[in-house]
């Protein structure tokens, strides 16, 4: 790994963050959502999404390894969200690094929401001290968001 840096996302680098979000979201949701729905998640659409999150008060951070941007994460008060690492850069510790960075930025005990079918993300969060709270947002018959909280 090269020189790693985590920067706040601004208008100067939001396109890079949106590209990571779009590519990683499409990959992580390919077995969960329809192909048509996945195709909607373009860099341009995700730029709008990230901008709206920033307008709501979220701080979004971009992780670079050397001269390449590889991952993003957001923090809004005590909620960690939008943790995405490019598929080809996964399993190199970037997700854990972003998660630990975000945990330090939280205003209280860190929590997050994860799709019940996203087992890779659930394992990452469990390895890093998060546990299910039992809170659930039902999205469809087979899909729910599950709340996890850092247990200290």
Regions of interest found by a model, annotated:
Residues 111-114, 131-147:
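Conserved catalytic-core motifs of GNAT/GCN5-like acyltransferases
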Residues 63, 89, 93-101:
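Conserved acetyl-CoA pyrophosphate-binding loop and the N-cap/start of the following alpha-helix
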Residues 4-19:
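A short beta-loop-alpha structural element at the N-terminal edge
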Residues 79-90, 114-115:
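A short, internal acetyl-CoA/4′-phosphopantetheine-binding micro-motif in the GNAT/acyltransferase core
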Residues 55-71:
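Conserved beta-hairpin
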Residues 125, 130:
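Conserved active-site tyrosine of GNAT-family acetyltransferases
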Residues 105-117:
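Conserved GNAT acetyl-CoA-binding A-motif
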Residues 22-49:
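Conserved GNAT-fold acetyl-CoA-binding loop/helix
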